[in-house]
């Protein structure tokens, strides 16, 4: 069983993540984690914090000489701005005179609409929002990206590779039916301002971000995560909480600012008749092929072995530069919300975080299915499982070719 946990605050000394259940022999280095965190800082429309935020990584345990040892893996991400915050965010009590007059210590009594501020104050009994926003901040996702590297390395040993990309920023969207990126396209995606695979759409997205910045607005969008090389049978239909799509949806909805998730064609499927909503199968070249992949690689809560496709919709960042109307809870008077440093558009970063969360869920499901205390044992178990599938049930991730589709139409005619 793979379990993960994060700790730390946005302006605390460090963020810490622990992932347990990692088999021995997984390749993992500090450089791999640093590279992933650098990808999280990418994207047109990011705020000033990305310019000076340097993620100093230390692997604290579970790894020796670049290989996991079978124990929990602990990763620390130090906060380079800690010297400015060490009194305000100190774990131990601080003399009030030391904090007196510090702007960073001023009570945040004007909760920001769309953030956790007001409800967090109600729930935990705080009289200001600082304790809420420090933990609720999307800065915490840096730790999940770091832990996602561990999961991605587990999946890589099984031949599963992930890629994320931006499909929409506000109303600017990649055209329906546009080519999908593959893992080999990651460098090109990371070089694109919005991590968009369509150059023309990317240029329009940049223009939309510029217009929003000028207007004092923020923008949301949609990201998609793809997983190639999936084995069939990850997840289960026997209980709701073991369904792979249920777990993926929960993990993605747990990312700050994500408001919707769809698998495969998702909500578009609801607009189609049943005959055009599902993936028919046929036999060709010695295996079963699906004619399409509208399901996005998941049927009945289990991976099909086809390309896994899942999307997440991100709302516009709630810290709007021109500040939204709120109430000052200290005075009860109308006010403008506190404006913390923020981005115009963080959709590209959301894709990297979504990729990490999908990796964690898929790695967890793979370890549940195949088991193994080492990578070698895990791979052997996977190979044994696949070899045990009867030939009549073996599927191919390749979609049926046009000739096979024509043959299927003939079969349809015969059956009717």
Curated annotation (Swiss-Prot):
Subunit record text: Homotetramer.
HAMAP family xref list: Chorismate_synth
Protein name as annotated: Chorismate synthase
Pathway membership: Metabolic intermediate biosynthesis; chorismate biosynthesis; chorismate from D-erythrose 4-phosphate and phosphoenolpyruvate: step 7/7
Gene Ontology cellular component list: cytosol
A GO molecular function held by the record: chorismate synthase activity
Entry keywords, A to Z: Amino-acid biosynthesis, Aromatic amino acid biosynthesis, FAD, Flavoprotein, FMN, Lyase, NADP
Comment on bound cofactor: Reduced FMN (FMNH(2)).
Family: Belongs to the chorismate synthase family.
Any Gene Ontology biological process: chorismate biosynthetic process
Positions with a binding annotation for FMN: 135-137, 256-257, 300, 315-319, 341
Cofactor requirements of the protein: FMNH2
Primary gene name: aroC
Pfam family name, one: Chorismate_synt
Record-linked NCBIfam families: aroC, PRK05382.1
Annotated EC: 4.2.3.5
Function: This reaction introduces a second double bond into the aromatic ring system.
Taxonomic lineage of the native organism: Bacteria, Bacillati, Actinomycetota, Actinomycetes, Micrococcales
Catalyses which reaction(s): 5-O-(1-carboxyvinyl)-3-phosphoshikimate = chorismate + phosphate
Binding site for NADP(+): 40, 46
Alphabetical list of PROSITE patterns matching this protein: CHORISMATE_SYNTHASE_1, CHORISMATE_SYNTHASE_2, CHORISMATE_SYNTHASE_3
